[in-house]
Amino acid sequence: MRDMLQLVPMVVEQSARGERSFDIYSRLLRERIIFLNGEVNDAMSGLVCAQLLFLEAENPNRPINLYINSYGGVVTSGLAMYDTMQFIKAPVHTLCMGTARSMGSFLLMAGERGHRAALPNASLHVHQPLGGFQGQASDILIHANEMQETKRRITRLYAQHCGRTEAEVERTLDRDHFMTAQQGVEWGLIDRVFAERDAT
């Protein structure tokens, strides 16, 4: 069963030179689609940041599409992706398919304003940063202060991207807060709900 979960489909393309095969993610990358599927961690962050930088180098004016299905994960890994999204010149359009929770929703709202979306049955979730520490009391206090600073930074960024006051964001993030896709639009996390693909 584990091998099936790690199976990556291959696609075959015909051209004048013959057949070429790609793993599905490489094929999507050619269409400027990055798929963030699973836990937000250092490995995922490295892959997503590298793909963002590669696509910007190819064409800094064409949008990049970041499709998200994630329960979240490590805050610093998510912030690395966030900073890269803001740093590159190419606009990043975000779309939630499935769920965007915790750092997943944070990355969803970090997309280009007007181009942040979710599919109709997507589940969105926001909360304050989580952490746990062990050790000497003085070290625990240092970590707690750092966690408070991270919480303030994330609150400011949600407020900036969602058009809310920091006080509103802090109240919402105080406990686990789930939203439907439509509620995500109303809160400012996303801009629209896609019922079907736009005609191109």
UniProtKB/Swiss-Prot annotation:
Subunit structure: Fourteen ClpP subunits assemble into 2 heptameric rings which stack back to back to give a disk-like structure with a central cavity, resembling the structure of eukaryotic proteasomes.
Gene3D superfamilies for this protein: 2-enoyl-CoA Hydratase, Chain A, domain 1 (3.90.226.10)
First-listed, main subcellular location of the protein, grouped into a coarse class: cytoplasm
One Gene Ontology term of the molecular function aspect: ATP-dependent peptidase activity
Keyword Signal: no
Location of the protein in the cell: Cytoplasm
Protein name: ATP-dependent Clp protease proteolytic subunit 1
One Pfam family hit: CLP_protease
EC number: 3.4.21.92
Domain of life: Bacteria
InterPro entries: ClpP, ClpP/crotonase-like_dom_sf, ClpP/TepA
GO biological process, any: protein quality control for misfolded or incompletely synthesized proteins
Catalytic activity: Hydrolysis of proteins to small peptides in the presence of ATP and magnesium. alpha-casein is the usual test substrate. In the absence of ATP, only oligopeptides shorter than five residues are hydrolyzed (such as succinyl-Leu-Tyr-|-NHMec, and Leu-Tyr-Leu-|-Tyr-Trp, in which cleavage of the -Tyr-|-Leu- and -Tyr-|-Trp bonds also occurs)
Residues the record marks as active site: S102 (nucleophile), H127
Lineage: Bacteria, Pseudomonadati, Pseudomonadota, Alphaproteobacteria, Hyphomicrobiales
